[in-house]
UniProtKB/Swiss-Prot annotation:
Entry's cofactor comment: Divalent metal cation.
Residues reported in the UniProt entry to bind a divalent metal cation: 166, 217, 235-236
Subcellular location: Nucleus
UniProt-recorded name of the protein: Decapping nuclease RAI1
Gene responsible for this protein: RAI1
Length: 383
């Protein structure tokens, strides 16, 4: 019988110290699924003058031409390939293994933290963990998550409007490099969710060091010729305008989740577009990530301590993973685990050799690419 462990979501860590996130690399992902390491070609720049709001921008225009790149079961949307390539490039440059205990995507860590605040019904956690070379690599299995089927439904229009807001509020190059013609025609640009720019960030909580990959929506102002542009990135969100008490409470819950998303990788700015019931963009508000905890504390008694509570749970769950899973430095010794959220606890179960997933996870490319495995073996020999 393999290893098995549970962590109840009421658990909190006494230690809540956070390490300042630092960017160690980035990559661009194309619609075709290519990963371009240390390439910023898919990075967007924020541009939405206040005068644009007078044009009654329709967040549903072009909906029938939307290039939907998610939901295809033949495309592994959860792959760690781009993240591993970027880490390998960093290690080749430094000639040492990246100092990390856990390597994954921000979205996965957000899911795990959200387990303390949501039920499994609304926050499904079904992850695979690989212990390799002294580190834990975590990913979701490749499962198609198709968008809402009815393209005329309110659900689909809400889904699309978020991508449309990103398209309307960003340009593909810094403003001085964009032609007037491109600026004037950008409202007609076809929306696509296949191109992505991913930052790779080193951070930590308590004694746990993490490397997290996270999609970046845009640069707010400018980029520097430095190795770390985190302070220039911004998160874009779009939601229905707030006009009632119930809507205010719903928006505050959204803000908490947005804060969680941004604080994990050190993104300091959130820009919210507010639309009306006809999906016309009515206003835009900018928030500092640092001000969100105080905003929630002053406005919603239920969320008074939510941000600090999230940090303490973050510390508890990472401590639990590191103490529960053996991590051998050898690049030859590999173990796989299934991590799920059931009722009121996270459940970790070792995947046995008899399991149908075992061979693909441990010996195949279910989590690690063969290129990355070979790189780590050669790095170990050279050190």
């Amino acid at each position: 019988m393999g290893l098995s462990a549970d962590l109840f979501v009421q658990k909190r860590s006494a230690a809540s110290s956070l390490k300042q996130p630092k960017e160690l690399g980035f990559y661009s992902k194309t619609q075709e699924g290519q990963f371009l390491v240390n390439d910023s070609s898919k990075l967007s720049y924020y541009y939405l003058p206040d005068t644009e709001l007078e044009r009654n921008l329709d967040l549903c225009s072009g909906i029938k031409k939307f290039k939907e790149c998610f939901g295809n079961p033949d495309v592994d949307a959860c792959t760690l390939s781009g993240l591993l390539k970027t880490i390998q490039a960093y290690e080749e440059r430094k000639n040492k293994k990246v100092p990390a205990d856990i390597i994954t995507f921000r979205g996965i860590m957000r899911k795990l933290i959200s387990a303390a605040f949501d039920s499994p019904k609304y926050n499904r956690v079904d992850l695979r963990v690989l212990s390799f070379n002294g580190q834990l690599f975590i990913r979701e299995p490749n499962q198609a998550h198709p968008p809402p089927a009815n393209t005329s439904s309110m659900e689909y229009r809400s889904y699309y409007s978020g991508y449309k807001f990103e398209t309307l509020s960003t340009i593909s190059k810094p403003l001085p490099q964009v032609t007037r013609n491109s600026l004037e025609k950008r409202h007609k640009r076809i929306c696509c969710n296949g191109d992505q720019y991913i930052t790779v960030v080193r951070s930590g909580v308590g004694h746990c060091k993490l490397v997290l990959g996270a999609e970046v929506d845009c640069v707010f102002d400018f980029t520097e010729d430095s190795s770390d542009n985190l302070k220039h990135y911004a998160e874009l969100k779009c939601t229905k305008g707030v006009s009632t008490f119930a809507e205010a409470r719903a928006f505050e819950r959204k803000m908490f989740k947005t804060w969680l998303q941004c604080f994990l990788v050190g993104i300091n700015r959130v820009i919210y577009g507010f639309r009306d019931e006809n999906f016309i963009l009515r206003s835009v508000e900018e928030y500092s990530t640092q001000e969100v905890p105080l905003l929630l504390k002053n406005n919603n008694p239920q969320l008074t301590n939510a941000c600090m509570d999230a940090v303490r749970w973050y510390g508890a769950l990472t401590e639990w993973l590191l103490s529960s899973i053996p991590r051998e430095e050898s690049a030859e010794h590999i173990r796989a685990y299934r991590l799920t959220f059931e009722n009121n606890h996270l459940k970790l179960v070792e995947i046995e050799k008899s399991d149908t997933e075992y061979d693909q996870l441990v010996n195949g490319e279910g989590i690690l690419t063969s290129e990355f495995r070979e790189w780590r073996k050669s790095l170990n020999k050279s050190l």
